[in-house]
């Protein structure tokens, strides 16, 4: 085979993950080739250099000791999850030892379940399996192992992963629950990336979906092998009693993003999908132990608070006894992600007194499961022998599958596992109360922003809600939870309905709004009768379709934003250009203003010059008039001078008359020419001879008119000459010659 096989049986390679042997572990003769570095070698390995999760065979013979092994069969010097039957590794992570008291505990281990009567606590909180009634020591990091005794009370761990009871497999740090079989850290007896073979107890994988069979284990990333068939990654999971959840919440044969199957004995994942719920959604049904960050396990004993606000509960289930005075209180922290309290009453018995569960909430919490203001997680259900707690952000649908038979009813309860399938939901909780034995009636509710859809606990409830707040299915057992809402929380109150035991086979469902009170009783206000179904955009769609729609919408909005940004950029450019134009215009206007001011100054200067010239002319005129008056007196005294003056004035008069006559003659000639031209144009049918005759006639008439005017002028001249006598000359002499 290749040098790096995954899940190959009986292969020889330098590096392999989870190579399971094809032969039976009981046969001591079947051996594999030496591996320098191996993970989860199920058969008898011979001198492995480095091994993870090598399960030991039943025969203690023919097994050498690796120098560094994880879950090796014999005593490794450093081991992770080695279930050793012979000796104990000096350093082990999750080494679950056998039940025989001959084995010892490792000095350093993660979740090493050793069967010692009084085990010492390990460094990272590997609580050992207690075969007797002794209580194991508390672990600092809280990686829990299952307790074999039903009466033993394991102490709480440092980081809040509780130790569960014997019926419920404990959760590992990453969601793998090492129950009865030897479970290594990175894989069980099946291979790491391939389909695992069936084992006695189902262990959840790291990221993958666990198998749906009751005796199957899940690989790290791969789909598990199941007795009924493997479930795809995006399908509805089948319910399987006993499957454990993976790290991101895929439980049983439920896929990563599917409606989770309700299992009776499943352990939750690290991020709070309780039970067999996937990462985004529904919580499992009865018997689910909490995860690392979110949920708290049900128990009757008090729990010590964890440093990060993850409330832990050490569950101690007492069989065939009524848990009357059990009242667990979760310690409140300053900043908590989830604290859920759920009282686990007696399995298959009717509680004689109602158990009181009280959860104290923190000042700032994400999803306290007990009646908070706005809950993103599941509500606490006071169910007998089954309690589920909500995760941090997983909006889980809690369905209690154990139908408790009331005191007045003698009919046995039908403990059919109810498979609750839900998408991620943000809505009002739905409480389903089952008081009588009922057959597995499958109800299928589809709500968008779904309010409560009440369903019986024994029926398989498929809730495809877009953002619906979880369903809590409470049994008919009378419980009085004391709930305290936090000051600030993201959770709607999950209704804890207190119902009386019913004798008839009827399903009583109601959704009540619980008012938090300081007393031990919960006050049920008026029940919400018909909760309307709110629309949702992501109802019935896969994650890929939702992401594609979001991507297309993001691209469209990005395109619109780019268009608007380009338009704004164009406007900005135009504004900048106009700003430049305005600046240039302002500069030019400033220049024009300066030019206008200089022009005004020049005009003022010219005006002053004109005023000076006017003053000079006035002085000159005054001087000329003065000279004329002085000389006139001398001219009047001389006769010859006076005669010359009169002749000069007469010549000026004649000249003016001649100018007037020339003007008149010019106007007459123009009018005559205009009239003759009009007559010639008016006559169109004239011959050239007629035209010549007409022209000659006009010339003749003109000459005759000139002759007449000349005679008139000559007569007038003669008259003027006759008038120029001596007396007239004297009268004409005093005229102003300068006028």
From Swiss-Prot:
Q: Where are the sequence repeats?
A: 6-7, 17-18, 50-51, 52-53, 68-69, 70-71, 78-79, 80-81, 91-92, 93-94, 108-109, 110-111, 124-125, 141-142, 159-160, 174-175, 186-187, 207-208, 221-222, 248-249, 271-272, 280-281, 308-309, 366-367, 426-427, 449-450
Which residues lie within the region annotated Disordered?
18-67, 79-245, 281-329, 341-366, 399-418, 471-533
GO CC terms, sorted: cytosol; nuclear envelope; nuclear periphery; nuclear pore
- Record-level GO BP terms: mRNA transport; negative regulation of auxin mediated signaling pathway; protein transport
A GO molecular-function descriptor: structural constituent of nuclear pore
Q: Which residues form a coiled coil?
A: 584-674
Question: Which InterPro entries does the entry link to?
Answer: NSP1/NUP62, Nucleoporin_NSP1_C
Q: Which UniProt keywords apply?
A: Coiled coil, mRNA transport, Nuclear pore complex, Nucleus, Protein transport, Repeat, Translocation, Transport
Q: Superkingdom, according to UniProt?
A: Eukaryota
Give residue spans, biased composition: Low complexity. 79-218, 232-245, 472-519
Question: Does the keyword section mention Transport?
Answer: yes
Cellular location(s): Nucleus envelope; Nucleus, Nuclear pore complex
Stretch list, region 26 X 2 AA repeats of F-G: 6-450
Where does this protein chiefly localize? nucleus
Quaternary structure (record): Part of the nuclear pore complex (NPC). The NPC has an eight-fold symmetrical structure comprising a central transport channel and two rings, the cytoplasmic and nuclear rings, to which eight filaments are attached. The cytoplasmic filaments have loose ends, while the nuclear filaments are joined in a distal ring, forming a nuclear basket. NPCs are highly dynamic in configuration and composition, and can be devided in 3 subcomplexes, the NUP62 subcomplex, the NUP107-160 subcomplex and the NUP93 subcomplex, containing approximately 30 different nucleoporin proteins.
The UniProt family comment states: Belongs to the nucleoporin NSP1/NUP62 family.
Domain remark text: Contains FG repeats.
What name goes with this protein?
Nuclear pore complex protein NUP62
Tell me what organism the protein belongs to: Arabidopsis thaliana
